Amino acid sequence: MDHFLYRDGILHAEDVPLSEIARTVGTPAYVYSAATLLRHFRLFDEALAWGPHLVCYAVKAASNVAILKLLGDAGAGMDVVSEGEYRRARAAGIPPDRIVFSGVGKTESEMRHVLREGVRQINLESEPEMRLLSRVASELGVEVPVTVRVNPDVDARTHEKIATGKSDNKFGIPISRARAVYAEIATLPGLRVIGIDVHIGSQLTDLEPFRLAYRKVADLTEVLRADGHAIERLDLGGGLGIPYARSNLAPPVPLEYGRVIREEVGHLGCEIEIEPGRLIAGNAGILLTETIFVKHGEGRDFLIVDAAMNDLIRPAMYGAHHDIVPVIEPAPGADQQAFDIVGPICETGDTFAKARHMPPVAPGDLIAFRSAGAYGAVMASEYNSRPLVPEVLVQGDQYAVIRPRQTFDEMISRDMVPHWLE
């Protein structure tokens, strides 16, 4: 469920007409619903209420500091994968003991910053990383809680670019090597084992891969405890998917996901961490755009809008589907016409949808791309020298710009001409 609904013939974000946001902020613009973000976070929190837990929002999904503060004030922890994300979480007021640092390529400078500031735990992904972290922690005179991300070789049944738990993926340590890795960590100064980490992919719409992975984690927990390691915490990652098309079958809900976790690892007495991102933010945001032209081509018609692939890359990168709807509610039974919905960028790949059936659309009409809250604004670029678009947060009948539209001067001012060209 989300809070983007038609009311009085106009699509609203909670109690605010999207047409009002377009008038005052302009288009394109990302618009988020605070009520939807909070509802989705609380669904996860309630799904794990049977035991000690922390829901760590995956900052990479939508990293605006206002969104992080909204979720943090509700009790969320944060899963970060870079110093930049860590700094965003801290800027949002998230205490270090609620920040988990993940990622396959942590640098020494990132480690130093995080260890100086404090962190809940660091999820290690390789032997070279754990040795580097040991050296850095020793030099700083601190002991850091760590888990090891194990790769369970489980097929997540998702897009190949967002699958992370197969043996040929770059993430984690093969589960077959886990005992040896934990044994080495026990000898390294500055590191204190507190648990196990696993994450098998994103946009999963089937619970069985989770069940298989968590069963392997449960077995490994018993083995590592027998070896003398204190396995007190299980970071089970994220990945639960969302319905990008209203016609999709509904994916599992957090309550069902929480039940799988309890069935597979609940008997171990561990604190549970999860790292949802897409399900919290995905349907909590839309990309608001305006039709520039309706172009009639040879054999197909085009809606050319002012948003482009630099604003929302998912259709071009993943072939992803987003429901696309007019802001003005079409009349019941209105005629439908097939359009290719495209942006202004000079690539054929700048296509949001092909042969998508839409009611009559004219230049100036507003259109909303649904389910754009996750991996939308965070993956935007300035390709074709297009400024980054604003982000707007709605709560009830109020809204605020939480990131202003980038100006051309701001974009160009970062470039520097060397003196020998002047």
What positions do the PLM features span?
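A charged N-terminal "starter" segment
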Residues: M1-P145, T187-R192, D219-A226, D397-E422
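Short acidic, glycine/serine/threonine-rich loops at helix termini
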Residues: I67-L68, A91, M111-R116, L133-V136, ...
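Hydrophobic "anchor" residues on beta-strands that sit immediately upstream
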Residues: C56, P145, R233, E271, ...
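Conserved beta-strand positions in the central sheet of alpha/beta enzyme cores
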Residues: D79-V80, N123, T147, D197, ...
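Active-site-proximal loop/turn and secondary-structure-junction residues that shape catalytic pockets
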Residues: A61-S63, G84-E85, G105-K106, S126-P128, ...
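Short beta-strand segments
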Residues: A58, P145-N151, D197-H199, D235-G237, ...
